[in-house]
UniProtKB/Swiss-Prot annotation:
Residues 32-38, 91-94, 153-154, 270-272, 325-329, 400-401 are extracellular. It comes from Staphylococcus epidermidis (strain ATCC 12228 / FDA PCI 1200). The gene is glcP. CDD domains: MFS_XylE_like. This is Glucose transporter GlcP. Its main location: membrane.
Amino acid sequence: MKANKYLIFILGALGGLLYGYDNGVISGALLFIHKDIPLNSTTEGIVVSSMLIGAIVGAGSSGPLADKLGRRRLVMLIAIVFIIGALILAASTNLALLIIGRLIIGLAVGGSMSTVPVYLSEMAPTEYRGSLGSLNQLMITIGILAAYLVNYAFADIEGWRWMLGLAVVPSVILLVGIYFMPESPRWLLENRNEEAARQVMKITYDDSEIDKELKEMKEINAISESTWTVIKSPWLGRILIVGCIFAIFQQFIGINAVIFYSSSIFAKAGLGEAASILGSVGIGTINVLVTIVAIFVVDKIDRKKLLVGGNIGMIASLLIMAILIWTIGIASSAWIIIVCLSLFIVFFGISWGPVLWVMLPELFPMRARGAATGISALVLNIGTLIVSLFFPILSDALSTEWVFLIFAFIGVLAMIFVIKFLPETRGRSLEEIEYELRERTGARTE
């Protein structure tokens, strides 16, 4: 691929950075919000989970919008929504405004989760699709780390408004940057604009590959089914179920319990407020570094092998952490918790973190890719909502180690699911994957 065109993918993936920032920033901001706006454990859970309720709506609506408006224009709209939500949060003076701001941010987060991976996948040449698709996850981890660093920087002045409001900066960069980016060539071809699709492909593809790729795209488009006909068809229904289960397993393994409540977990272990936030910075740094490694291996190692290997590592980390907390006690095991959470992040960041966002768009056909990815993202957000809402409740009711054991058991189920139900997609064009899945499920391809 032409090296100077990576800017397209970096700017396209900025939506992932905003998703990560708004996921990560709340863990530090919660330590100080309650000093200005009274919060108890219930209202704290509502503030955290309200973003996820918005994300469910955003993910569910953005899929059809991405297919109708185009990937690029929808990302521009998402950036505007991010800006509005961040400004409301920064200006919040009561619980209601906090919840409204988080709901609006959630709309943008849900839209970003379903639209950005599709845009990156459809723009990328086959041999680089895994690496470039992983840019979305890398940006998510950079956003989380940026949130932790901002939290630490403003901890001394208890500046939670700055923590929440600074999301405006990358939102404006995304809005301006995506304005100058091209539309997905597959969306252009789907909307009968072959010449524009060819011009875009000249930017990201080698010239020798363009005719072959366009031929495959047109053959798939020749299957005369509308978006909703494809979505309602039995063959896609089976694939959509696989995609949704894949998405919800990523959350039920417990990653966002770590992201949302990392500062609170460290505080419970006996660290001070600033030290708890600094511990989260370390977690975020590891997340970024291991995702960079994933970018270089995701197109060299089969996707399923990465997922299974990551599962084994995450399960081991959770089990060790649970046993040590059980035997030593959470107040006496702060550094053990940091080490175990770090290992958990390493194994997640090399596997389920990037691979989910690479594979989801790969599983679905062109005519329904935006809508089907949106539905999967909606289900993922429901899973995130359940985890974030019930983790502190279960942690108090059952103790933290039992919650980690539950996550480990779910990790075993996730590994079985990957082995039995997920197809391998590495090294194959999106059109080749669609042909195979149609044949495996008995759908016509003529």
